[in-house]
Design a protein with these regions (language model features):
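Short, surface-exposed beta-strand/loop micro-motifs that present aromatic residues
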Residues: 247-256
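Short, surface-exposed loop or secondary-structure junction motifs
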Residues: 1-110, 151-245
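Residue-level detector of short, conserved catalytic/binding motifs and their immediate flanks
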Residues: 139, 225, 249
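Beta-strand-connecting loop/turn residues
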Residues: 127, 234-236, 256-257
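Secreted, short cysteine-rich peptides and small extracellular cysteine-rich domains stabilized by multiple disulfide
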Residues: 111-150
């Protein structure tokens, strides 16, 4: 399943489309968003690796079908509440005070030939700084980062930061969870401890081991289930990163220490 970005818009607020309806329109030939070439790779299963946000969304919808409840509600009852993640929400409608969450910013102005996002791993190949998802620090893949992009990543050719808006998108199980670093720490602790945090089990230990297992080593030697391995600080890390408009996140575990 490929991501066809032209039909995956950001909404001002939560998506107006329910997850199941969106996926039906995306994945079925009669769907509004369907494109055989745009939505699917022509590679045979098990022969190629493609990062897929809509693949993650489809897993979220599978949770809905198996549990007979919306994905966000399932997570509330089975992950967030058991782990006492009191400030965690997939949807903006679940947040009482939007002033409590960070406003994303976007870059505007410039001449089109400077860095257009802040962070490592989200630069276009046509721009002077291009980093891939494996880089750990800016200097790993862009030795002149500060010179080209400025110390804060805002560039030097009329680039300005301006507030965007609180947004959502239809494939939301692939991202858009809003929470605190302390809450994520509880979730990560459960992974480190075989699915248990503070005496509460959210996953079986066998499930954790399956997630950690590289699925197709001949294709991608770093990819487990959703999460992946990378080298950093002279050790192997396991986790995931993500980027959206005005946002870049990383969460990794070191099983060494």
């Amino acid at each position: 399943i490929k991501d066809q970005w032209g039909v995956m818009p950001y909404y001002d607020g939560d998506s107006v489309l329910e997850l199941g309806y969106y996926l039906e329109q995306y994945l079925t030939p009669q769907g509004e968003f369907y494109s055989a070439n745009g939505c699917f790779s022509d590679s045979q299963p098990g022969t190629n690796y493609i990062y897929s946000n809509n693949g993650a969304a489809l897993i979220g919808y599978l949770v809905e079908r198996l549990s007979n409840q919306p994905f966000n509600e399932y997570c509330n009852e089975n992950i967030f509440e058991p782990l006492s993640m009191n400030n965690a929400a997939w949807l903006l409608s679940e947040i009482d005070d939007l002033n409590q969450i960070a406003m994303p910013y976007q870059l505007s102005g410039g001449n089109g030939n400077t860095c257009y996002e802040i962070g490592c791993g989200i630069y276009d190949q046509s721009n002077p700084c291009f980093c891939d998802s494996e880089c750990v620090y800016y200097d790993d893949c862009c030795s002149d980062y500060d010179e080209v992009c400025g110390e804060d990543g805002s560039g030097s050719s009329g680039i300005q930061l301006s507030p965007l808006y609180h947004y959502g998108y239809s494939d939301y199980p692939s991202g858009q969870l809003r929470t605190t670093s302390n809450n994520l720490g509880k979730f990560v602790s459960a992974y480190i401890n075989g699915g248990v945090y503070n005496g509460t089990r959210i996953l079986e230990e066998e499930t954790i081991e399956l997630i950690k297992t590289v699925q197709y080593p001949n294709i991608n030697s770093q990819q487990g289930l959703i999460w992946y391995y990378k080298n950093g600080n002279a050790q192997t890390l396991f986790g995931h990163n993500g980027g959206d408009l005005g946002s870049l996140t990383e969460m990794f575990i070191s099983y060494l220490n």
